[in-house]
Design a protein with these regions (language model features):
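A hydrophobic, helix-centered structural microdomain
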Residues: 1-67, 184, 189-205
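A generic structural signal for residues located within well-ordered alpha-helices
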Residues: 18, 93-96, 111, 186
């Protein structure tokens, strides 16, 4: 059923990809030079490592270690637990590594458009927990296996709940909620909510709270 869902969505998403991809690619090259595509190793289903494709939104000379240091500081311990308790957001405030066009691409989520390539390669789904880099995945401890039991997605439940404004603990909570509550109807709701949050306004999906 998940494969049928992805194929159906790809029928509509590929024309969007073909239209916007060359435009954004050229804008990045003109504005910030090569490369326009950022390739990074991420953790996929069952812990398999794959190469994720995104549009580059940061200066080519930016310090990648800063991101890892930020995550470890947020975790404040070797592993994290899922929780809805408010915490420090994942987002790095006033991140001067992000380019001008990168700010627009991140705000509209168009930086994730090359993820379509990963979906076509069978490494990702259209909806699912976002693929993590290896050092992020290690922070999940015993929750790694459950979170990585499904394919990562272009968008997911955590993304429509707050994306980078969530804490690491909140994101893990919603990722686990998705895995435990997965169904096609939920996928359609998340997809619709993603479109709404990008193009109209930012609202929230709600799931029944566990007792």
């Amino acid at each position: 059923m998940k494969i049928i869902f992805d194929i159906t969505i790809m029928v509509f998403l590929i024309p969007v990809f073909l239209f916007f991809f060359p435009i954004i690619y050229l804008l990045i090259i003109i504005s910030d030079g090569y490369p326009a595509i950022y390739v990074q190793e991420r953790v996929g289903k069952n812990g398999k490592i794959f190469k994720l494709f995104k549009f580059r939104i940061m200066d080519e000379s930016s310090d990648e270690d800063l991101h890892e240091e930020h995550y470890k500081k947020l975790a404040d311990k070797e592993t994290i637990e899922p929780s809805l308790e408010p915490g420090n957001p994942i987002r790095i405030e006033n991140d001067d590594r992000i380019t001008k066009i990168g700010l627009f691409l991140r705000k509209t989520s168009l930086d994730e458009l090359p993820n379509v390539i990963n979906v076509l390669k069978g490494e990702m789904s259209t909806v699912g927990p976002r693929p993590l880099v290896v050092y992020e995945s290690k922070l999940l401890g015993d929750y790694q296996k459950k979170r990585h039991s499904v394919k990562p997605g272009i968008t997911g439940l955590a993304q429509v709940q707050g994306r980078l404004d969530l804490s690491l603990q909140e994101r893990l909570y919603w990722d686990i909620e998705y895995v435990e509550n997965y169904n096609i109807v939920l996928d359609f709701k998340i997809l619709f909510q993603t479109i709404i949050s990008v193009t109209v306004s930012y609202t929230h999906l709600t799931l029944p709270t566990k007792a």
